[in-house]
């Protein structure tokens, strides 16, 4: 692709998200979403493969439907209240439709089916953008409008997302699908706590982006897309394999790694607000995620026979990408748990 076109597309993606993040006017928020969506389509289709085309079409149809629902919600609210302000979503019907729209954009259950399919059909770099950067705009709108949204519906979808995110990843062998289901589960955790402590949602989002970015960087570095290719990584880059499996454990919320911090704080916040049943359901559902990560680790480390490197691997004779950012990201993705008391003090 032409470097000028790549620069224009990247600038439009960043500009669209920035407009959403900085706007309090519903029409400008909608325009930002549309700019971002139209610019991300060529990024998803850059491999010129039929699967990429199919994934891009699914993404386009889903996001277009969500944008239509958002515009419908804004119009209903405008008719009843005369307000364009994002913080004033007073009409119950508009509030319900807006909740559905944002859930569809984030990939919350039961609107989650597009996330694994789209992630599986696109290249790793596009998957990284889809599962990290593309979550910023809808979550920022959810953060702003959360006091006016249908919280019963949002909590129900959050619980379903945590359950389906763990359940859907159980029998997967494709790493992109595993990370997609992990994204669904993490979105469930973030939206569950947003009505009690919105700042905790931002902390969870930050750690999720850190861990997901680190894993995708390792997958891009080694060109690994399946669980079998991780097993072959032992012969080429054993240290990188250990790092990736450790970060997967962190993503699953295993103490004493960084990923345990947001789950600990969210469960503590839910119990503090007398939502013990909700905290129990989410904690039990998180075990599903941890199970398929541990199964992946077990299959990679303990079920492979010791072997010499007699297999010509895809990355063996290619120039490897530089990894100058990887040590910092790895440390932040695994060793932030001791900062939990300070985070609790800042967020309370």
Swiss-Prot record:
It is a multi-pass membrane protein. InterPro entries: Complex_I_Subunit_2, NADH_DH_su2_C, NADH_UbQ_OxRdtase_chain2, ND/Mrp_TM. Keywords: Electron transport, Membrane, Mitochondrion, Mitochondrion inner membrane, NAD, Respiratory chain, Translocase, Transmembrane, Transmembrane helix, Transport, Ubiquinone. It is found in: Mitochondrion inner membrane. The keyword NAD applies. One of its GO terms (cellular component) is mitochondrial inner membrane. This is NADH-ubiquinone oxidoreductase chain 2. The lineage of its organism: Eukaryota, Metazoa, Chordata, Craniata, Vertebrata.
